[in-house]
C-alpha cells in the first residue's frame, strides 16, 4: 500500500524583531553599552519608525537608572530619573523589555549584506531611549543612512566628550530660550522643551505633533538640519520640569 507524501513546505521565515547595531564602550564614560534597533512600535506619536535603543549592556536599565549608571547612555542630562528629573520615558516598560530581549539573545548582530534591506524605505528614530551622542558618531551616522530619513535628539552639547558632528545629525535639546540661543550660535538646530503658554522665539516652530497632530513619521523636521522646534513638556513626570529650570538657569 502506498501513502501520500507528507508536506515538506517550510513555514515562511518570521521577520526579524530587531538587530544589535553596536556593542562597545560609551563615548561618554567608556562603560559597556549596546544599540538595538527594533523594527515595529506601538508608539502613536512617532508612528511606525524603526526605533533605536541605547542601553547599558551589562545592567538592567531600571537598575542603571536607580544607581546613576545610566550616565553612560544619558550623560549629564538634567532630566534623568536619577536626578529626579522630568524625563518622559517609562524605563520599566519598553527599554526594560528590549533589554530583556537582548539578554535572551533574540536580536541578531546586524550584518549589512544580510540585513540592510530591513531598513530600506524606513524612517529611523535615533534614541527612543538613551542619547545618540553616547555612541560613536560614525555608528549613528551609518544607522541613519540605512533609511530614508531620521529623527534624533541629544542633550550632550555641554559634555566634555561630545562630538560636534552630532550637530548635523540631531536636534540639540534645550531647556530654556537662553540655552537654545547658545546652541544655535554654535550651529545647532534646537529642540526646546517649554511650559504650556510659553512664547515661541521668532526662529522656532511649534512641534507639529502638538500644533497639527502629525506623527513624527509624517513630519521629520527633527533631523538636526531643518528647523528649531519647541514642544510643551509632556509625560507623567512633567510636573518636575519647572524645578529643573532653576538648576539649568535662564
Indicate where each model-derived feature is located.
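Class I S-adenosyl-L-methionine
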Residues: 1-250
